[in-house]
Amino acid sequence: LSLRRQRQMCIRDRNCIIHSGTVIGSDGLGFAKNGKKWEKIVHSGKVIIGDNVEIGAGCTIDKASSGATEICNGVKLDNQIHLAHNCHIGENTIIGANTSIAGSVRIGNNCMIGGLCGIVDNIQITDEVTIYPMTFVTNNVKNEGAYSGGPILMEHKDWLKKSVTLRKK
């Protein structure tokens, strides 16, 4: 893409620090099944980065399929974080290294997300939430507070049995 077109896709405000190796405005994982083939869905949106944002080295931030992927004022991203298309990261939120956030996730203001977390698509996390490291977020977080949890490595069949037990409690 031309430099002019890239600038249209990414709007950056004042006092931002973006470390080396970071890619901003890449296409998200947008494909539709057509018979036995996958066809690319055009991502025509953009990335908006607020004031006083710091983005660590080696991060990837996908542009929106339409609309915007938004990183609000005061956000701090550690190294090697992936933000998929159409995400919204609220003001003064900090996210630890190697966290992967799937498409259309909305994280509120003043949150802390520990390293090595995974957040599945379309999740909403309210303001003032702490997610401890290595937590896999699969449900909306509607109440402020601290959350943790991550499965211990075990055979999948055993994990399925244990997860059913946890859901019953």
Predicted regions and their residues:
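Glycine-rich hexapeptide-repeat left-handed beta-helix
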Residues: R12-R14, I18-I49, V53-K169
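Single conserved hydrophobic/aromatic residue that forms the stacking wall/gate
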Residues: L1-I11, H85
